[in-house]
């Protein structure tokens, strides 16, 4: 057993024989790039000059009424592409180029990973094909248009629930027959080894930056670090720097959708059971017969019935706790951040903010809370408009 492939009992590489050589080649190339100074230098140059890192850490001025609480936002909404997805899309695309691949395939839910992949492919002159569920295409028309503008081909997926998990299935199918010239640029910290580790590595600068920024501003570490969790890449990116700092509480916030008591949610770690999906062992939403259940969230990027295996491990070990926020709570947090701070957040990030605002009200001691504002909300404006029927009161 490859111990590097596992986080406790979670992770692994449960794939068809056809994909074994592709994953082996990828793991070897990834391990080599970690030691390759030229690769690292080029990647960090692009993060600085093209992506716009480091992203700011912003202290909220008005949204928190409790005088004992300072709420900071890690502003991934301000980087090129509008979300944290660009960090790792660029890392993987650069790796693919180094491997001699000429074609990139990706899956996308909210469209942000598709846009980030299209951006990276345009920059590095790689052919780009993005698989997207028909349900998500309707929800995210502007991101589909962005992908087309950036030169990507968007392939509509109608199978299953026509959402993210089905787009992943189609991408894996394509890769099984095309891996000689194609890299599958998986969008979250899930899937078969080495993807969870690779995606975490290409997102860990979020947590590294927060750590140095908060020490500079406050001369101490935060009490809480909070991030939304769908697949979990933005969360593992910010958590990674604090895993050994036991005094820092790590909180992932899942989509409770219409309520955890309904079957219309995406709270995999709160309501799921352990199983295998998309090549890794992790918590999954399942029905009574063990089939993968459909997830629901107002946010397309959290609408996934699985979660990255390291989050399953962090839950089991108790190092992180996983809470949830409903569609209604996320919408309310979205409105509040717009009106109180002048920042339009992604609906995904609004789930983390919703929980952070509830927590802030309860804090009885001086507390510092950091929320990963994983993306901006331009893509969600029509969803929010329809949900609120155009009214903001």
Swiss-Prot record:
Keyword Plastid among UniProt keywords: no
HAMAP family: Trp_synth_beta
CDD domains assigned to the protein according to its UniProt record, in alphabetical order: Trp-synth_B (cd06446)
GO biological process: L-tryptophan biosynthetic process
Underlying gene: trpB
Top EC group: lyase
UniProt keyword list: Amino-acid biosynthesis, Aromatic amino acid biosynthesis, Lyase, Pyridoxal phosphate, Tryptophan biosynthesis
EC number of the protein: 4.2.1.20
Source lineage: Bacteria, Pseudomonadati, Campylobacterota, Epsilonproteobacteria, Campylobacterales
Reactions catalysed: (1S,2R)-1-C-(indol-3-yl)glycerol 3-phosphate + L-serine = D-glyceraldehyde 3-phosphate + L-tryptophan + H2O
Molecular-function GO terms, alphabetical: tryptophan synthase activity
Function: The beta subunit is responsible for the synthesis of L-tryptophan from indole and L-serine.
Cofactors (names): pyridoxal 5'-phosphate
Family assignment from sequence similarity: Belongs to the TrpB family.
InterPro entries: Trp_synth_b_CS, Trp_synth_beta, Trp_synth_beta/beta-like, TrpB-like_PALP, TrpB-like_PALP_sf
GO CC annotations on file: cytoplasm
SUPFAM superfamilies associated with the record: Tryptophan synthase beta subunit-like PLP-dependent enzymes (SSF53686)
Subunit structure: Tetramer of two alpha and two beta chains.
Protein name (Swiss-Prot/TrEMBL): Tryptophan synthase beta chain
Residue numbers of N6-(pyridoxal phosphate)lysine PTMs: 85
Pathway linked to the protein: Amino-acid biosynthesis; L-tryptophan biosynthesis; L-tryptophan from chorismate: step 5/5
Listed transmembrane segments: none
């Amino acid at each position: 057993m490859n111990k590097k492939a596992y986080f406790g009992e979670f992770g692994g590489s449960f794939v068809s024989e056809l994909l074994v050589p592709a994953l082996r080649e990828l793991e070897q190339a990834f391990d080599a790039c970690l030691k390759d100074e030229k690769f690292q230098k080029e990647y960090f140059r692009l993060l600085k000059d093209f992506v716009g890192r480091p992203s700011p850490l912003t202290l909220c001025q008005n949204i928190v009424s409790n005088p004992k609480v300072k709420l900071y936002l890690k502003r991934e909404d301000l980087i090129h592409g509008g979300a944290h997805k660009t960090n790792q899309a660029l890392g993987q695309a650069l790796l693919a180029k180094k491997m001699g691949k000429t074609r990139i395939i990706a899956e996308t839910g909210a469209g942000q990973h598709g846009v980030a992949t299209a951006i990276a492919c345009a920059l590095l002159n790689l052919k780009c094909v993005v698989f997207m569920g028909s349900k998500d295409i309707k929800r995210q028309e502007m991101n589909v248009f962005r992908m087309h503008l950036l030169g990507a081909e968007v392939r509509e997926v109608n199978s299953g629930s026509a959402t993210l998990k089905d787009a992943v299935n189609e991408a894996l199918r394509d890769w099984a027959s095309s891996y000689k010239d194609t890299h599958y640029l998986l969008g979250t910290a899930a899937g078969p080894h080495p993807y969870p580790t690779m995606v975490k590595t290409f997102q860990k600068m979020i947590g590294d930056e927060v750590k140095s920024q908060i020490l500079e501003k406050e001369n101490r570490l935060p009490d809480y670090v909070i991030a939304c969790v769908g697949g979990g890449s933005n969360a593992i990116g910010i958590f990674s720097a604090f895993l050994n700092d036991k005094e820092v509480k790590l909180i992932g916030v899942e989509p409770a959708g219409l309520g955890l008591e309904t079957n219309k949610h995406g709270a995999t770690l709160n309501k799921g059971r352990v199983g295998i999906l998309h090549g890794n062992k992790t918590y999954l939403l399942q029905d009574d017969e063990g089939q993968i259940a459909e997830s629901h969230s107002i946010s397309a990027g959290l609408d996934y019935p699985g979660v990255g295996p390291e989050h399953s491990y962090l839950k089991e070990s108790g190092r992180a706790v996983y809470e949830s926020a409903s569609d209604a709570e996320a919408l309310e947090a979205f409105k509040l951040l717009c009106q109180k701070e002048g920042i339009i957040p992604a609906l995904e990030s609004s789930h983390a903010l919703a929980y952070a605002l509830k927590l802030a009200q309860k804090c009885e001691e001086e507390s510092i809370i950091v929320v990963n504002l994983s993306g901006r909300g331009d893509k969600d404006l029509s969803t929010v408009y329809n949900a609120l029927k155009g009214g903001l009161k």
